Amino acid sequence: MTLYQPESGYSYNSDSLFLYDFISRFNPKGELLDVGAGCGIVGLLLGRDFKTVNVYGVEKQEHFIKYAQKNAQVNEIKYKLFQSNFLELEEQKKYDFIVSNPPFYPEGVQKSEDAVLLNARYASNLPLDDFFKKVSRLLKPHSHFIFCYDPTAFSDICTAINRVKMRICDVQFVHSKENKNASLVMIHARNGSKSMMKVLNPLIVMSENEYTQKIKEIFLKTDTQSIKCQL
């Protein structure tokens, strides 16, 4: 998949590819909304590989809108994009899947002065409670919410998810190496579920200075090529 990205500033990284792989295990279908779509990478990969899914994206930064539209066009994927702050998105339409790689840099991390980076990275732009409340209002009954986040916020995530009557069903932590602390957590939650939480085997990125076999498989499956340009 060819993906156009801005020449400078925020670019997608491997977190989005890992999230795509995690979402894939739940066989997405029906109406799917990608929150904070950026250049469209997560939603477009799902639209490419799951033919029974109708992909929508919401992105508030005009800077990214034209890249997401261009990427949908060149990859010939049907993709409807809303330019909106997610918290202000109209609620008439309901979704079977909501997925997101949201901003999650915590308070206390030195903030960029670049407005695009500021909006794309920092959790203060999409607080957990507000985020989850909005998701709960946009999901159909017994639907799926799948996202990644800073693993140090896992306790806060569990508390906030419970407040909106959703249940975490599956969790996978990502580690750069086997002996390193987790750098990412990927979470599958549902509304109306009574399932016990499953903690999946961790996703290990590197082993002895090379990518693990699983990571190589993810990169091969996603098959993305990035083109930095100015649109």
Question: Residue ranges of each PLM-predicted region?
Answer:
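Glycine-rich, phosphate-binding/catalytic loops in enzymes
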Residues: 20, 114-117, 163-164
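Residue-level signal for inorganic ion chemistry
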Residues: 19, 101, 131, 189
